[in-house]
Regions:
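Alpha-helical transmembrane segments and their membrane-interface junctions
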Residues: 60-85
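Alpha-helical transmembrane segments
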Residues: 3-22, 93-96
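Interfacial helix-start motif at the membrane-water boundary
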Residues: 46-64
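Membrane-helix interface and helix-disruption motif detector
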Residues: 1-9, 78-87
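Alpha-helical transmembrane segments of integral membrane proteins, especially early/N-terminal helices
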Residues: 13-24, 55-61, 117-134
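Membrane-water interface of transmembrane alpha-helices
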Residues: 18-39, 107-112
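Hydrophobic alpha-helical transmembrane segments
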Residues: 1-9, 29-48
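Alpha-helical transmembrane segments and their immediate juxtamembrane interface regions
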Residues: 84-129
Length: 134
């Protein structure tokens, strides 16, 4: 029983990291209105520092399964170890792509927030100029 739990631990940790990354991407896409056309996009807030900190936690969670696999490999049976040997590279590529997508989504949200702030300031300036003309 103990060998089964140890054998499943790297896979479970990897799945937690994937869920963590997908949730960060989903929240960022939602808050940043990334798929809303610019003319219909509501005001976008800048990326919260809590999301940036969560991204670093996600990055750490993405790294954890690989050393856990290395340290627990002696306690696993041969079939489980062979599975992880075959799944390790694709798993690393998937988690790397998800962490990279987190960064891209946060960048796009920050860009949309910058456009919102520019529109807000330029809108105030254009109204101020119209008031000066009257």
């Amino acid at each position: 029983m103990n060998g089964i739990v140890v054998g499943l631990l790297p896979g479970v940790l990897w799945m937690v990291a994937v869920i963590f990354a997908v949730s960060i991407i989903t929240i960022t896409v939602s808050r940043g209105h990334l798929f809303t056309p610019k003319r219909r996009r509501p005001p976008v807030d800048p990326v919260d520092w809590s999301m940036v900190k969560t991204h670093f936690m996600s990055f750490a969670a993405a790294l954890i399964p690989f050393p856990v696999l290395t340290f627990t490999a002696d306690l696993m049976n041969a079939r489980m170890l062979a599975f992880y040997d075959h799944a390790q590279l694709p798993g690393a590529i998937i988690i790397f792509a998800l962490v990279l997508l987190e960064l891209i989504a946060m960048y796009l949200q920050a860009r949309n927030a910058s456009e919102t702030e520019m529109d807000r300031r330029l809108g105030v300036a254009s109204h101020r100029n119209k008031d000066d003309i009257k």
